[in-house]
Amino acid sequence: MSDSWYKVDNVAKVFLATATPQDPRVFRISCTLNEEIDPDTLNEALRSTAQEWPQFQVTLHRGLFWHYFESTDQLPTAQPENKAPCAPLYTPERRNRLIYRVTYFGSRINLEMFHAITDGNGGLLYLKSIVRNYLALRHPGELDSVPSPNSASAGDLAQDSFAPSTVEQSAIPWQKRSRSTASTVCACPITSSSSLRAT
């Protein structure tokens, strides 16, 4: 067990607050190959990918006042698909488990993630890494020229991309206005970000 823990960003808090058994806030991305999935090779590729993306190797915990992510030494294991798509990933009985799952069926690899950990773009990049590592193991030498989808630094991958857009109350340049002045002050800059965490 690692000592590292991470704050849950504001967008993740929304998903935590609104997740229900009927709407568990889980999304699924899949990739269908031209060949049957080999489970042993997929698990080897998944372990390799998990080491490349340590920010997804976390469990979600409830603190006294807030939730937080804690790094874990657990390794993901790909399982045959045997549940309904997007089954809950964060429930009281799953508290100390990873909050994503990888399954396979026939020639398809499925990635399901709890939305508090990343958005669809982050999930897609993670699945691309799994598939690339899987195909590199299945067909040695054929993917040497294909770059890894994970080209960002560990710091870039772990950052809260909404933080630059957040303005503290004391930083807003409020001006005293009369009631007759009908105008709105907006001090939040609009920024773009290439990090994984978004909505």
Write out the residue ranges for each language-model feature.
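Soluble acyl-CoA-dependent acyltransferase catalytic core bearing the H(X)4D motif
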Residues: P24, I29-T199
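N-terminal low-complexity, Ser/Thr- and acidic-residue-enriched intrinsically disordered segments
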Residues: M1-F15, A19-Q22, F27-T32
